[in-house]
Amino acid sequence: MRSLPFGFPKILVSSAAAIPGLSTRFIQTSDILLFHSVVEIAGLTGLLKNVLDRAGLAMAGMLQGPATEPSADRSRAIAMTMLSPCERCARMVRVALEKNGYSVVGFHATGMGDRAMEGMISEGL
């Protein structure tokens, strides 16, 4: 699933979604929607069927929306990492850049955000 392009609808239903640190291994730097099943995926119980029905409806909703294309004008785009203690400064920098015609895309500076930023730059997004 991670090899599918950014913006392509992806849903992963997992009973392990709430295990600390494990979801990072599933998602890594992709835009996968992680849907916690709460109940174990073993036999089609009424509760599991409800979870799978809702996951299917979520996917159907995503498929009804317009396909998102990367920005046509990437020449004026700037990727910027942001972190809570520096948010005020980052916001001021973002506003100044936007006033000068740049499109600023913010990424969280910890965890997978920095790697996601590098990956998206490599993909030309």
Regions found by a protein language model. Give the residues of each.
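Short, low-complexity, polar/charged sequence segments that are solvent-exposed and flexible
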Residues: 7-8, 30-33, 52-56, 97-100, ...
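Short acidic, glycine/serine/threonine-rich loops at helix termini
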Residues: 2-3, 21-27, 45-48, 89-94, ...
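Cap/lid and interdomain-hinge subdomains that line or gate substrate/regulatory clefts
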Residues: 21-85
